[in-house]
Amino acid sequence: MKRIFITFILYLLVLSSVFAQKLTIESFKLSENDISAQTQPRKDLNDRNCALVKVQFVGTISEVEGNVVKPLGNHGNETWVYMPQGSRQLKLLTQSYLPVMVTFADYGVEKLESNRTYVVVITKPMSSVG
């Protein structure tokens, strides 16, 4: 009986790790040569141009939380997120993975600047074939 209970617990642990997979933030950086935030600007509530964060992710981003000026822009595997100057983080929600919090200071960007384009690359976990 004890053996069955331990096997059941191990099965639940493995099952939960399969369904609660985490995405990885590969990089977040200022894209010096990308002028999309200037050529396709969006204004915040104070009538100032926003910063543009391009989220590169192969999959569906269902929602973005934080100081976001909506609507989001979908460009293939890239989601364009406009954020006011001074924003410090954003939270990405996807269909099949745990939410991802991107804190810009962790990648050397204290806060976003107006009219600048940033790129964040998000990757899925490697699937284990057993």
Where are these regions (language model features)?
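Short loop/turn and low-complexity linker motifs enriched in small/turn-promoting residues
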Residues: 21-130
